[in-house]
Design a protein with these regions (language model features):
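Core catalytic alpha/beta fold that binds nucleotide/phospho-ligands
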Residues: 1-163
């Protein structure tokens, strides 16, 4: 599932196991973010996409939500500069990756994925401006955080009754 260059990057974080595992998790998270953003998920062969970590905002020992690391992508050996990736620590050795790419790259095998797009075709200048925007810090939320204020008391009563 990893290209030779990705395995080399993972091994280069050694010899300690934990840094290698963190690099492994970052790469895996990037592959998931890319294939889910495309719409084909695990149907896309992970070996076809190759990531290189680094870029503005990257750094070691980043506290959760404090900094964003970037990555670049090649698919079948071809650089994909129109795709932008952001990796953030969620703490407890977990990583979240988000991706931004052209809607035209989306795969819609069942005909429902592209219907979720707010804008199916994005003019090139708008796409560049959107891709250049900084990535906001990832914020972890509980289910209760997502319940509207007007329903929160009812939700909390129901949640407490089922514990």
């Amino acid at each position: 599932c990893f290209a030779d260059s990705e395995w080399a990057a993972i091994r280069a974080c050694g010899p300690e196991e934990r840094p290698m595992e963190m690099c492994f998790r970052k790469h895996w998270s990037l592959k998931e973010a890319f294939t889910k953003a495309r719409g084909d998920g695990i149907a896309f062969e992970f070996l076809r996409c190759e990531f290189e970590l680094g870029g503005p905002g990257s750094g070691e020992g980043v506290e959760p939500g404090q900094s964003v690391e970037t990555a670049s992508l090649k698919v079948d050996g071809k650089p994909m500069p129109e795709w932008h990736f952001f990796i953030q620590s969620m703490g407890d050795d977990h990583w979240v990756s988000t991706s931004r790419g052209p809607p035209t790259d989306a795969v819609d095998a069942l005909g429902g994925f592209k219907k979720t797009f707010g804008q199916a075709v994005v003019p090139p200048l708008d796409a560049k401006a959107h891709a250049a925007r900084p990535e906001p810090a990832f914020v972890t939320k509980t289910v209760a955080d997502l319940v509207p204020d007007a329903l929160r008391a009812k939700y909390e009563r129901l949640a407490k009754a089922h514990i």
